[in-house]
Amino acid sequence: MKKIVTIFTILLVVLSLSSCYDRDVLDDKGLNYFMPMTENVQYNQDNATAVTLTWSIPSVIPEDFRRPISVQIQIVENNIYRDRITLVNEETSHTFTIDPAKKYRYIVKLVGTFTEENQETGRTSTVTSEGVIVNVE
C-alpha cells in the first residue's frame, strides 16, 4: 500500500510540473509598434572629466506616440550598471562628469508614450527603442 501511495504521489508531481501551456500566449507581447533608434550618436570628451553625448531624433516617429519623445540614457561604469536618466523634451545632447580612471558605456534609447487614442487597457503605455551603445575609455 505504501508503494502505491509513493508511486501515485510521484506521478502527481510529474504531471503537475509538466502540465500543458500555450507558448504563444507567453511569447505574445501584444504590441505591433516600434520606436526607431537614435541616429548619429557620438561623444566628445570635452576635458579629462567631462563627456558630451550628442544624437539626433529620427525624422519619422509614428503618430501613435505623444511628442516630445523622451530619451533614456543608461550609464555603465567599469561594467557595472550605475544609473539611468530620462530627458523628456527631445534633447539632442547631454554632458556627464566622469572619472578618467574608469571606463564608461552609455546606452542611448528613445522612449515613446502612446497617445490616449492608442493606449490599450492593460497594456504598457510606453515603447522603448533598441539602444545605441557608446564606449568611452
Which residues does each predicted region cover?
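Pro/Thr/Ser/Gly-rich low-complexity, intrinsically disordered linker/stalk tracts
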Residues: 21-65, 116-137
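Bacterial N-terminal signal peptides that target proteins for export
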Residues: 1-8
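Short beta-strand segments within Ig-like beta-sandwich modules, predominantly Fibronectin type-III
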Residues: 84-90
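Residue-level signal for short segments within beta-strands and strand-turn junctions
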Residues: 57, 73-77, 110-114
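Short, linear, compositionally biased motifs with a strong N-terminal bias
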Residues: 10-11, 86
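Extracellular low-complexity, O-glycosylation-prone stalks/linkers
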Residues: 61-83
